[in-house]
């Protein structure tokens, strides 16, 4: 029996369809019409928040902004092969000079210091400029008597900068401590992914720690742990809901609810 032949009209209709009409959620694996994700880029089936740039998140969360330290540029301290090309690619993809946006913003009618790490820039990895901008964020917030809201998204320390990258964990943590000693509020919002040295330092030092649904949060990756202990880990291991159940975080908040939720928290602590 011969196969039916596609008509020229059918072929033309298929060719006219735009690409990437459908997208698969990396968490629930359900396919969705891309437009159904909405402006917030959230899976309509499980509420997983797709990874977005810092500037996109800024447009979702804040109504007024002033960027700080935008002129800081990453160098290549170790002359690491291919690093300058990766930096250029990250800058082109995000419009940032490194993997974090910092500044002053208004969220839910409340003024605060705001930091947003960008997973589209070398997976939000922590380099010298990222660490410096975060340190200055907390220092300026302390001087201005402002609360800090920090959206964390990172694969960890940036290997292309070696020990220079690892030093940022302690440097940012010291600035967080000084901000805390001044009696000021720090809200940490963990997004997908928050891993490695970022989790091991400032991401988990907030007075209030929130997370987006189903975000991957941890230190070492699943495969590394499974190979080390020679056991299969549970399906929801290192997911936001598991951390909430275990008491590591305070709440899981859907992306579209974050402006009002954060605004209420800021209002309570600045009244």
From Swiss-Prot:
Keyword presence, Transferase: yes
Taxonomic lineage of the native organism: Bacteria, Bacillati, Bacillota, Bacilli, Lactobacillales
Enzyme Commission number, as recorded: 2.1.3.15
The CoA carboxyltransferase N-terminal domain, residue ranges: 21-271
Binding residues for Zn(2+): 25, 28, 43, 46
Co-factor binding comment: Binds 1 zinc ion per subunit.
This protein's name: Acetyl-coenzyme A carboxylase carboxyl transferase subunit beta
C4-type zinc finger span: 25-46
Location of this chain's protein in the cell: Cytoplasm
Family label: Belongs to the AccD/PCCB family.
InterPro entries: AcCoA_carboxyl_beta (IPR034733), Acetyl_CoA_COase_Trfase_b_su (IPR000438), ClpP/crotonase-like_dom_sf (IPR029045), COA_CT_N (IPR011762)
Known catalytic reactions: N(6)-carboxybiotinyl-L-lysyl-[protein] + acetyl-CoA = N(6)-biotinyl-L-lysyl-[protein] + malonyl-CoA
Primary location class: cytoplasm
PANTHER family: ACETYL-COENZYME A CARBOXYLASE CARBOXYL TRANSFERASE SUBUNIT BETA, CHLOROPLASTIC (PTHR42995:SF5)
GO cellular component: acetyl-CoA carboxylase complex
Protein role: Component of the acetyl coenzyme A carboxylase (ACC) complex. Biotin carboxylase (BC) catalyzes the carboxylation of biotin on its carrier protein (BCCP) and then the CO(2) group is transferred by the transcarboxylase to acetyl-CoA to form malonyl-CoA.
UniProt-listed SUPFAM superfamilies: ClpP/crotonase
One GO term (biological process): fatty acid biosynthetic process
Matching Pfam families: Carboxyl_trans
GO molecular function, one term: ATP binding
Metabolic or biological pathway, per its Swiss-Prot or TrEMBL entry: Lipid metabolism; malonyl-CoA biosynthesis; malonyl-CoA from acetyl-CoA: step 1/1
Domain of life: Bacteria
Species whose genome carries this gene: Lacticaseibacillus casei (strain BL23) (Lactobacillus casei)
Assembly and oligomerization: Acetyl-CoA carboxylase is a heterohexamer composed of biotin carboxyl carrier protein (AccB), biotin carboxylase (AccC) and two subunits each of ACCase subunit alpha (AccA) and ACCase subunit beta (AccD).
């Amino acid at each position: 029996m011969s196969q039916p032949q596609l008509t020229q009209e059918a072929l033309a209709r298929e060719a006219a369809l735009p690409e990437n009409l459908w997208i698969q959620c990396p968490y629930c694996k359900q396919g969705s019409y891309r437009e159904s994700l909405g402006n917030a880029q959230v899976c309509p089936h499980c509420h997983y928040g797709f990874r977005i740039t810092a500037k996109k998140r800024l447009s979702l969360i804040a109504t007024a902004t002033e960027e700080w330290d935008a002129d800081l540029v990453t160098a290549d301290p170790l002359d690491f092969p291919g690093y300058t090309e990766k930096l250029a690619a990250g800058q082109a993809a995000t419009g940032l000079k490194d993997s974090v946006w910092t500044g002053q913003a208004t969220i839910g009618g409340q003024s605060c210091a705001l930091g947003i790490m960008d997973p589209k820039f070398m997976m939000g990895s922590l380099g010298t400029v990222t660490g410096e901008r975060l340190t200055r964020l907390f220092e300026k917030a302390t001087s201005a008597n402002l609360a800090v809201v920090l959206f964390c998204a990172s694969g960890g320390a940036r290997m292309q900068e070696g020990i220079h990258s690892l030093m940022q964990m302690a440097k940012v943590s010291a600035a967080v401590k000084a901000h805390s000693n001044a009696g000021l509020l720090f809200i940490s919002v963990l997004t997908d992914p928050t891993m490695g040295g970022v989790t091991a330092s400032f991401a988990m030092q907030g007075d209030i720690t929130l997370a987006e649904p189903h975000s991957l949060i941890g230190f070492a990756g699943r495969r590394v742990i499974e190979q080390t202990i020679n056991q299969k880990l549970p399906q929801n291991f290192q997911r936001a809901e598991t951390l909430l159940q275990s008491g590591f975080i305070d709440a899981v908040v859907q992306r579209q609810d974050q402006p009002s939720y954060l605004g209420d928290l800021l209002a309570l602590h600045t009244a």
